[in-house]
Amino acid sequence: YMRNLFVLVLLAITLGCNCAPLKRGSQDDFRAMRDSMVNTFQQGMLQHDTSLVMQSWRMSENLLQVDKTHKENIYHHRAVVMAWLGRKKEAIENRWLEIQCMTDSNPDKLVYMAKKYTIENKKDSAHYYISKLLEFCDSNKDKHYNDQKSHEGYMAYLKLIAISLNEGPAKGKEFLDKQLKKDPGNDLYKYLKDNWKDFLKYLNDKT
């Protein structure tokens, strides 16, 4: 399911922590704490050890008190922890807190809000964020990056989400098929085609 991919993406960009509470400290201290937080969760996840996962959760609580510059990443981590534990309500709550820390132009925020309002059948609000997401794709598609192929694939992925939400899954599938014809070796496109039902579940999941 796409949540597996979601968890991997979250882990890749989440920064980690140490359990001892601090009233003040350097950025190096906070970085070490964040690293410890993530490492503890990964260890608990791999060993299926709930006590380690909850230890990572407690680390995140300490970090929220002292590290004021990485709240987005910390809430991100907390959402992953709750999702892994199967506590969906708390996962959604922490995901929402993470979203509120993002800038309005952040594509993750645009995707989340577009999905949220589509699920809630708030058509005007959904259309607004879908339009913003499409604008983001159009304004960034011609920018040049070191890994141009990955950038183009990411822009196509965001556009696939927007089209699927706005025009329906059938139109989204047509768009994906066109992208595959252009780039048949693209691993992301092939994954999405092979796991299309999971992608549709992802579109209807607020986490």
What positions do the PLM features span?
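Residue-level recognition of tetratricopeptide repeat
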Residues: 38, 42-45, 80, 115, ...
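"A position-specific structural signal for the A-helix of alpha-solenoid helical repeats
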Residues: 35, 77, 112, 154-161, ...
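Helix-turn-helix repeat elements of alpha-solenoid scaffolds
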Residues: 45-59, 83-94, 123-136, 168
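Flexible helix-coil transition and linker loops at the boundaries of alpha-helical arrays
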Residues: 22-26, 60-73, 99-104, 136-150
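Sec-dependent N-terminal signal peptides
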Residues: 5-14
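Terminal, low-structured helical/coil segments at or just beyond the last alpha-helical repeat
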Residues: 158, 165-207
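N-terminal leader/linker segments that initiate helical-solenoid repeat arrays
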Residues: 17-61, 65-66, 73
